[in-house]
Amino acid sequence: MRVVVGIDDTDSHRGGCTTYVGYLLAKEVLRRWGAGAFRDFPRLVRLNPNVPFKTRGNAAVALDLEIPEGDVEELWRLAVETVAAHSRREGKTDPGVAMAAGGVPERAKTLYRMALTQVVSISAAERAGVLTWGGRGKIGAVAAVGAYFPKSTFELIAYRRGDREAIPPDLVRLLEALTYPYTFHNVDRRRVLIEPRGPDPVYYGIRGLTPQHLRYALSLLEAWGYRPAGWVIYRTNQATDAHIELGVFYGDPLPYSFYRARGLVVEARRVAGRHLVGRLDSGLRFVAYRHLGRLASELERCLRCDVVLYGGLKPRRGGLYLYVERAYVLGRYIPARSRCTYCGGSLESLGRGRGWRCRRCGAVFHSAPIRWLYDTAPRRALLPRPGEWRHLLKPPDVDPTIPNFFSPSSAEWIG
């Protein structure tokens, strides 16, 4: 029988990691039911990063399994016991578990689409038609059960025992040179991106498109002495634009949702800290942080540009602000003087208050209003520097259809 188990919210700001609990659960499933129980790689499901209840990256984990029907209750007990034993119950942490047996309900799939962009209630998760346990974490757990990946990437997550030893940037650049574009987002200038900076048990995480290239990257780091205590390859919706292609968008801006807004930039100015604050002609205000790099600097020069902005909506100073994560410039409105209505010739001024005269036919006009021309030459995408990419953002050089050709039987995926 097909059974999908989801877990979420097992970590806190002081430690822990939901992917690590998923790794431990996957090891137990392997021990009891063998590798044949896995219909797919374990899934790392990124959700709306703007919700105020998240710990760090707002990720849930799911296992898509095939086990005997009589073992379903045993699997449920195993999942609940594993989460309960390894959760960090501190601060906002409120772990949850969800399970669907025999098939995934459509309501769970809909909840996944909502959780990519919106704030979802616990009651909505409880009505999704799957078995649940725990607190607020059941929202992400149900979303992970309902997650489906038309496009995907992989991430090899290695776990540490003891202190995290820093990996030199030069070694990470070598790793990327040997594996790019089949691994990506490894280093940004001198900043190593594969190592987290928090107190969680993750040693490093390498994103890629094939399990084989990820295993090669792992062996390269091991050869240089950076050996993890354990590792697992997750299939994930990272770097796929899943929130844009599958997420639910509402017409009205809602707090803590991921939002898409099109409009004319009528204001863009730097404030304290060199952050950019601006406004669209609709009245929606937006913010682009200085450390976004080219995205903020180019958006500053986009006055009178027709743009599409993507980002998270957050309350600020009594209103909602869109915190920009990416932008698309569709065109710019350029002022141009009206031409002669008789012959189409250009007009010259006769002096202040005296009107305008056609250079070609001599016709005189009392006024020459400005015409606005729409220029599509500036059309381009504005992306942040790699170190500031959100997890779901798809880099322009990544093909998230490649991972669809791989299954757990095609490569070693856990160790």
Swiss-Prot record:
GO biological-process terms attached to the record: tRNA wobble cytosine modification
Organism: Pyrobaculum neutrophilum (strain DSM 2338 / JCM 9278 / NBRC 100436 / V24Sta)
Keyword tRNA processing: yes
Gene3D superfamilies reported in the protein's UniProt record: 2.40.50.1010, 3.30.70.2200, 3.90.600.20
Protein EC: 6.3.4.22
Role of this protein: ATP-dependent agmatine transferase that catalyzes the formation of 2-agmatinylcytidine (agm2C) at the wobble position (C34) of tRNA(Ile2), converting the codon specificity from AUG to AUA.
Membership in a protein family: Belongs to the TiaS family.
Gene Ontology annotations for the cellular component aspect, listed alphabetically: cytoplasm
Main location: cytoplasm
PANTHER family per record: TRNA(ILE2) 2-AGMATINYLCYTIDINE SYNTHETASE TIAS
One Pfam family from the record: TiaS_TCKD
Protein name, per record: tRNA(Ile2) 2-agmatinylcytidine synthetase TiaS
Catalytic activity: cytidine(34) in tRNA(Ile2) + agmatine + ATP + H2O = 2-agmatinylcytidine(34) in tRNA(Ile2) + AMP + 2 phosphate + 2 H(+)
Domain of life, source organism: Archaea
Compartment(s) where it occurs, according to its Swiss-Prot or TrEMBL record: Cytoplasm
Record bears the keyword tRNA processing: yes
GO molecular function: ATP binding; ligase activity, forming carbon-nitrogen bonds
Signal sequence bounds: none
Alphabetic keyword roster: ATP-binding, Cytoplasm, Ligase, Nucleotide-binding, tRNA processing
